[in-house]
């Protein structure tokens, strides 16, 4: 079933039984008319979003680098044209339909109604899909990453992202994508260890950067990413949901238009927020390792598809 686009958003055009309808998938559990849901919806409509959020132009590379280093994230608008937005939305919708039909109760793999694009693939990546391959050649992305990393020798880690269905009524706890290595237990992804005990991962330059692309408008109600500015270098304990102050829950990257790019230092604290709309919110991404940082990668693209890529894209995915 193909995607139905409306007002810059992706609407799920299938029911749990796979029958085409005007009703979107989602809203398992609490009803959208539940008093608590309606109260939260009113609260978010009034208060949600980072105050003074800057959406930069694609030519403001210097400012983008400056804001990224200060805040741990930056948003650049008009990175994708309308055709690219449609291609990306269609590609996301293919995965969303496949995953949603396998999970009729919307349990998710990142919490209720929440899913990882990478987590739905054996390779932890969607690099085999043309929609994600297209993103490798976005000009402004390479300009900004080269400036941040100080080199063109960065590589692709994965082509992933996440989506949340309407009816994701709960907040996801704040977290960081990377941690220091620790003895005992399971070593986290992209961990770092200083045997002298002097330097933390948070004292280093960004080890890897996540590039999120928006195939739909991100609004106050459809599950915007909450991002806590300046936390990429913080050694403080990340608060749980009970400890988290209200201002952090409202510190979301919205409103942001379809076609925008959000670059994130993955060390910064971030988390999912409620999607109280009637449309799925998708944020596909590309993840890049700094030239000095490496860890084992799972191949995510066939050699046949690799040969079809541009020279620039081939350089990025040479270990993917």
Features from the language model and the residues they span:
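Extreme N-terminal basic, low-complexity initiation segments
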Residues: 2-7
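Non-heme Fe(II)-dependent double-stranded beta-helix
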Residues: 9, 13-71, 77-193
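Non-heme Fe(II)/2-oxoglutarate
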Residues: 9, 13-53, 102, 233-245, ...
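Short, solvent-exposed loop/turn segments at secondary-structure junctions
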Residues: 80-82, 161-168, 179, 217-220, ...
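Active-site rim elements
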Residues: 128-134, 198-199, 248-252, 271-273
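A structural signal for short, well-ordered beta-strand segments
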Residues: 159-161, 211-213, 284-288
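Catalytic core of non-heme Fe(II) oxygenases with the double-stranded beta-helix
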Residues: 170-255, 295-301
């Amino acid at each position: 079933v193909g995607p139905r686009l409306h007002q810059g958003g992706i609407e799920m055009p299938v029911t749990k039984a796979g029958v085409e309808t005007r009703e979107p998938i989602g809203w398992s559990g609490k009803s959208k008319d539940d008093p608590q849901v309606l109260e939260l919806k009113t609260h978010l409509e009034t208060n949600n979003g980072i105050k003074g959020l800057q959406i930069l132009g694609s030519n403001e590379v210097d400012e983008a680098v400056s804001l990224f280093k200060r805040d741990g994230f930056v948003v650049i608008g008009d990175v994708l044209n309308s055709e690219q937005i449609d291609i990306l939305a269609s590609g996301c919708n293919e995965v969303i339909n496949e995953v949603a039909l396998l999970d009729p109760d919307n349990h998710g793999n990142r919490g209720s109604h929440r899913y990882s694009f990478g987590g739905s693939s054996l390779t932890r990546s969607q690099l085999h899909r043309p929609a994600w391959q297209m993103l490798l050649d976005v000009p402004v992305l390479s300009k900004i990453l080269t400036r941040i990393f100080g080199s063109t020798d960065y590589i692709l880690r994965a082509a992933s992202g996440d989506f949340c269905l309407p009816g994701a009524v709960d907040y996801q706890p704040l977290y960081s994508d990377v941690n220091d290595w620790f003895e005992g237990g399971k070593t986290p992804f992209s961990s770092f260890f200083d045997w002298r005990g002097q330097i933390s991962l948070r004292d280093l330059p960004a080890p890897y950067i996540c590039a999120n692309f928006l195939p739909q408008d991100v609004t106050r109600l459809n599950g915007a990413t909450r991002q806590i500015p300046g936390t990429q270098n913080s050694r403080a304990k990340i608060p749980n949901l009970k400890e988290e102050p209200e201002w952090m829950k409202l510190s979301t990257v919205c409103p942001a238009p379809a076609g925008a790019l959000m670059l994130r230092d993955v060390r910064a604290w971030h988390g999912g927020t409620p999607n109280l709309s009637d449309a799925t919110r998708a944020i596909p991404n590309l993840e890049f390792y700094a030239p000095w940082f490496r860890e084992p990668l799972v191949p995510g693209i066939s050699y046949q598809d690799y040969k079809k890529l541009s020279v620039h894209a081939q350089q990025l995915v040479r270990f993917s």
